[in-house]
């Protein structure tokens, strides 16, 4: 007999579900949330949720208005989906069977949001249970959409298509795996292509959107249908539905990335088409998707040149699109002199901590740094427990009303495309926009003035050579625009001046710097205290950019700069405080010890310490403040000592509190999980302090910490978040370098955790980049510990070797991680060469290959010393790699090695190794000549008297 609910539990549960969405009665809402959390443990909970969600009418005995019952169903769907997400394996099979049979009924519901919720539950089941967990689902969805019988309602068709679109988006990889010799995509893709001709525009756009999900993955099923898809796109290009045309634009953009050869023959027609779509400004999203085409083609090595003949057509459209729309102006005007008004909660952007960049000692490059240097970033939405469609019923904020300055839009996309074109084509781009600039930079109407300044800023990097002759005239005019009556003009002028600050900073005579660079710097600094908060923000951001470009040459101006920063600390509201910290830390980063002059410390530190006392341990402002203090501590070095103790103690307290809250949330699901950024920034600041101070004071701080630092660090090293572990291993390595006696008693606990972290299998596919950053820092810290711990590493050598070999032998591992693993392996041989010698033949080749690209630093010297000491223990094991080793020795630059006692004897060890082989190998001179190049052989003979 089919499962049936009991009346009383159904009544209670439905009441709690209704109250959980009761925004006007917070007490009832909180009580309902507690009751629902407790109800999760009931074995039948998912049956009840399914029953409520899939029943179109309120079951007998439940007296709700249609609006109330809709809220009950919506909340039931969200809770059901979250239960499936977090506890799929614990759900009984008969409950899952009920869900699978009932939820698809909701795809036929008259209410669009209920159909959307059904799609969310369906895709969650597929994500957790796999394709084989519900094999009949895909054929059923495809049959509903296809409607071959003609009996399927329009709502059911659209509901099934929306559900299939979600399944495709959330399960890209598993749909392209083989099941019984067949890949689901092999039948899904042709069906999706056929659905793009459906009479319903919603189905056409969702079908094409689903195809777009797969294009970047290049699945075989799509590649074999690519010509059919292209024909389909050309058919749909003038579809009456703008949603469909939007997906057409996106498809062409995606195909650029995977098969540029398919785009090239059609480039002329595509240029005309994208221009036409971008000019449909009544649909900004469509226009923005069309503008993405220029950005993508412009950044494509094989295609960008194909746009050259059309620049005269494309660039005017980009310039048109960079003028604020009337709607944007209506939203943005009226900001006026708002500097004294407090920020609203929604004005304050979430700030996410950057975990300590991976310790790429090898060449001093920071892994994960932004390599392209672009000034335009698309910010994706943050994932949470809600999928698309789930929040729409209860969210009062309409995203379309978001501040146009805070979202990726047509104006920003067009400016980014102009930036890319400037980098690609250089002079022709500036020549094309010059008449526009001449007309509009002094335009009477501010939106045109503003757009011209934006255009000038957009071409700054690509066209700098052709713009430079005009800058002596342009820069003073831009500085005058900093006093424009319209705040948006002042705002964009700050940005553009920041983009040209590298020109000002590079002026090489005092007279030229006084004429251009100093007024530029002073103008931007002044705007940091504009009467408009957006202008303040732009001024601060531009000044951080100027600091970066000027580097250490800004040192003589530190005092007036810091005085202005201090005034900003007194005046800024919350939102701009975040970017002010960035200004301070950028100054500290580039001026370094120049910041440690007493008068500068006396100006800056009271302002920072005042904020330090004012900001609570729960405030998000703590993240940028801690990060800023990390840079300041590094710059001040020993001069940070007077401020170190309370800062260090508070970081320990924040870490302890965060770990306690996390453990409590694990034990009790009703409690919120704490924000791990508090851990990341606190760990990084501890690292900076330990590096900055004299070792004696660092040791005192570590010894006196309550709770004990290394007991807390153990928990952080086991944290599930990659960012936390990345910072933890950075701190572990710093402690090994600077406070090893305090660390040593804890190594028995910490080293096994470190070895566990070096397992490549611990990296999750979806977190591969941050996963490698953790392993990188773990390798680095292992190398630092090996130097200090010496023979104490002996019990761990076999496991460490196994881990290092797996890393060095994996082609997927990034170069910086390979280098740090090689350094750590070499350092292990400093005191443990005897037990490593028997394994030498297994690691000599990967070690020499990976260490080859490392600069001649102290790190390389220690690694080569350890490796050479291992060779001396087992010279015969090097037979196949002697040529590679002799080449490395011949080319070795000794400057850094001579600077420390640890590696001062490296050249003698090389000599000793060569002498040993000379005694072992007959006709050693002939042997060397047969193994390495003549110049390298001559080098060896000269340096080592062979």
Where are these regions (language model features)?
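Karyopherin-beta/Importin-beta family HEAT-repeat alpha-solenoid scaffold
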Residues: 1-946
């Amino acid at each position: 007999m089919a499962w049936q609910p009991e009346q009383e539990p159904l009544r209670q549960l439905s009441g709690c579900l209704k109250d959980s969405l009761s925004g006007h009665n917070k007490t009832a809402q909180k009580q309902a949330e507690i009751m629902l959390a407790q109800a999760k443990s009931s074995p039948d909970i998912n049956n009840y949720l399914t029953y409520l969600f899939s029943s179109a009418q309120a079951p007998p005995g439940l007296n709700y208005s249609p609006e109330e019952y809709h809220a009950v169903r919506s909340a039931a769907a969200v809770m059901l989906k979250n239960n499936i997400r977090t506890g799929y394996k614990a759900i009984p099979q008969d409950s899952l069977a009920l869900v699978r049979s009932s939820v698809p009924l909701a795809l036929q519901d008259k209410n669009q949001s209920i159909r959307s919720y059904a799609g969310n539950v369906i895709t969650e089941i597929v994500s957790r249970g796999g394709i084989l967990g519900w094999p009949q689902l895909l054929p059923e969805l495809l049959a509903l959409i296809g409607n071959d019988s003609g009996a399927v309602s329009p709502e059911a068709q659209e509901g099934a298509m929306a559900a299939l679109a979600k399944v495709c988006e959330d399960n890209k990889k598993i749909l392209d795996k083989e099941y019984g010799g067949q890949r689901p995509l092999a039948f899904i893709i042709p069906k999706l292509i056929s659905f793009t001709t459906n009479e319903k525009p919603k189905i056409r756009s969702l079908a094409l959107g689903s195809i777009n999900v797969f294009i970047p993955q290049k699945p075989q099923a799509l590649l074999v249908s690519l010509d059919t898809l292209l024909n389909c796109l050309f058919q749909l290009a003038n579809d009456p539905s703008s949603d469909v045309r939007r997906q057409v634009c996106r498809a062409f953009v995606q195909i650029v990335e995977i098969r540029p050869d398919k785009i090239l023959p059609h480039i002329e027609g595509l240029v005309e088409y994208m221009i036409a779509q971008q000019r449909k400004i009544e649909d900004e999203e469509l226009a923005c998707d069309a503008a993405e085409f220029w950005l993508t083609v412009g950044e494509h090595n094989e295609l960008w040149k194909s746009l050259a003949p059309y620049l005269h057509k494309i660039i005017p459209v980009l310039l048109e699109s960079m003028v604020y729309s009337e709607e944007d102006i209506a939203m943005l005007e009226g900001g006026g002199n708002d500097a004294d008004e407090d920020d609203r909660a929604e004005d304050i952007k979430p700030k996410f901590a950057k975990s300590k960049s991976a310790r790429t000692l090898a060449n001093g490059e920071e892994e994960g740094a932004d390599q392209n240097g672009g000034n335009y970033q698309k910010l994706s939405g943050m994932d949470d427990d809600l999928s698309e469609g789930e929040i729409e019923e209860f969210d009062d904020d309409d995203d379309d009303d978001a501040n146009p300055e805070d979202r990726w839009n047509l104006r920003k996309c067009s400016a980014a495309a102009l930036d890319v074109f400037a980098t690609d084509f250089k002079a022709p781009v500036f020549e094309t926009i010059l008449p526009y600039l001449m007309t509009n930079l002094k335009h009477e109407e501010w939106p045109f003035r503003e757009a011209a300044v934006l255009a000038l800023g957009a071409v700054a990097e690509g066209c700098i050579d052709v713009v430079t002759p005009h800058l002596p005239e342009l820069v003073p005019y831009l500085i005058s625009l900093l006093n424009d009556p319209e705040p948006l003009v002042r705002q964009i002028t700050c940005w553009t001046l920041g983009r040209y600050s590298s020109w000002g900073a590079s002026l090489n005579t005092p007279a030229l710097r006084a004429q251009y660079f100093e007024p530029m710097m002073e103008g931007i600094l002044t705007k940091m205290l504009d009467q408009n908060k957006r202008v303040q923000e732009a001024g601060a951001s531009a000044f951080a950019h100027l600091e970066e470009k000027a580097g250490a040459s800004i040192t003589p101006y530190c005092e007036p700069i810091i005085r202005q920063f201090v005034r900003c600390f007194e005046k800024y509201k919350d939102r701009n405080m975040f970017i002010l910290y960035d200004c301070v830390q950028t100054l500290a980063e580039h001026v370094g010890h120049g910041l440690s002059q007493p008068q500068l410390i006396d100006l800056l530190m009271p302002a920072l310490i005042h904020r330090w006392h004012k900001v609570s341990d729960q405030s998000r402002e703590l993240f940028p403040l801690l990060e800023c203090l990390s840079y300041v501590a590094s710059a001040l070095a020993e001069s940070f000592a007077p401020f170190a103790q309370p800062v260090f103690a508070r970081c320990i307290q924040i870490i302890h509190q965060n770990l306690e809250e996390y453990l409590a949330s694990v034990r009790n699901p009703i409690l919120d999980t704490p924000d791990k950024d508090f851990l990341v920034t606190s760990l990084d600041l501890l690292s900076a302090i330990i590096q900055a101070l004299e070792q004696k004071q660092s040791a005192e701080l570590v010894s006196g910490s309550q709770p004990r630092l290394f007991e807390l660090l153990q928990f952080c090293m086991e944290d599930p978040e990659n960012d936390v572990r990345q910072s933890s291993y950075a701190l572990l390595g710093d402690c090994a370098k600077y406070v090893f006696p305090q660390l040593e008693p804890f190594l028995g606990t910490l080293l096994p955790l470190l070895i566990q972290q070096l397992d490549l299998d611990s990296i999750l596919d979806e977190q591969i980049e941050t996963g490698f950053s953790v392993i990188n820092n773990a390798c680095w810290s292992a190398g630092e510990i090996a130097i200090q711990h010496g023979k104490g590493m002996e019990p761990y050598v076999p496991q460490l070797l196994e881990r290092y070999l797996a890393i060095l032998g994996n082609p997927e591992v990034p170069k910086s991680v390979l280098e740090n693993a090689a350094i750590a392996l070499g350092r292990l041989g400093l005191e443990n060469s005897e037990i490593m010698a028997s394994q030498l033949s297994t690691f000599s080749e990967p070690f020499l290959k990976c260490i080859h690209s490392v600069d001649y630093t102290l790190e390389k010297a220690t690694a080569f010393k350890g490796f050479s000491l291992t060779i001396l223990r087992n010279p015969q094991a090097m037979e196949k790699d002697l040529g590679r080793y002799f080449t490395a020795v011949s080319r070795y630059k000794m400057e850094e090695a001579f600077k420390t006692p640890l590696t001062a004897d490296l050249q003698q060890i090389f000599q000793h190794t060569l002498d040993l082989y000379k005694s072992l190998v007959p006709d050693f001179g002939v042997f060397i000549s047969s193994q390495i190049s003549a110049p390298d052989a001559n080098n060896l003979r000269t340096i080592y008297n062979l």
